[in-house]
Amino acid sequence: HSEARILHSKDRTGAEIEGALEAATSGEGMTGLVIKEDWMAIDIIQKRHEDPLSGICGIWCLKPDGVVETIRGSAVILATGGCGMLYNSTTNPTIATGDGVAMASRCGADIRDMEFIQFHPTALEGQERPFLITEAMRGHGAVLMTVEDHIRWRKEGGLASDYSYMKKYSPMGSLGTRDVVARATDAELKMSGESHVLLVTEHLDEDSLRDSFPTICKRLDEQGLSLGPDPIPVRPAAHYLVGGISVDRFGRGLKDGEVIPGLYAIGETACT
């Protein structure tokens, strides 16, 4: 953007949103709201089996003790996220298994555009589960280089951005759009045979980096790496499900364009 206009909380925006929601739902005045931790939704209950347009009347859940319990209700809202665990490398948590989409499909809802998956271009390499390195870091001035680019830059000197492979793929260089950067990085890795590229921050102020990206710094410290002195090994990883449950503008689940009474889908699990 020509002006910085994205609302964020350093590199912990998601955690801050989650914390605010947790605080709001656990405070006084939230009568009628019951949170069931470690319960797993198994399936949606239809008013008439195999008749999606008859409507929804609840869900079946698997309790931690292995007992299945019925929860009745006039509406079910699916907010189960994406399906990143289908991929070998993903930034998603282990619970992102696409169960909400599967449940909606089994009760007759239309599912759209599941072939479209967004890949984040900079996930920390060498982790059991890739750790997302925010794009804000490239906005801060970090530059993507191949291992060979980095060796050449250290030897010859000059502007770090002049040595980035991204110059071949986008006039914006390392600030290219997420899809362009992810595809470019994948292409470079296939050509080089390397397992990762490097996110270079050596040319940036270390104190400013630590102030702006405390969570990332903490994770890198655990790996024996430091923003500033060390190039960070990164590679693309599955990040966001673009498709999902077909809904209208009110989030109501659809079957052949008709509303399924009582079924709603919001967030990543919906296709909006």
Predicted regions and their residues:
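Hydrophobic alpha-helical segments, especially N-terminal targeting/anchoring helices
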Residues: 62, 107, 145-147, 158, ...
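An anion/pyrophosphate-binding glycine-rich loop and adjacent beta-alpha core
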Residues: 103, 109-233
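Conserved redox-cofactor binding core of oxidoreductases
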Residues: 1-67, 72, 79, 120-125
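Glycine-rich phosphate/pyrophosphate-binding beta-alpha loops
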Residues: 86-89, 119-125, 238-239, 270-272
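Flavin (primarily FAD) binding-site architecture
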Residues: 78-92
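A glycine-rich dinucleotide-binding beta-alpha-beta segment and adjacent secondary-structure elements
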Residues: 36, 42-57, 62, 212-270
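Short hydrophobic core segments
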Residues: 70-81, 104, 263-265
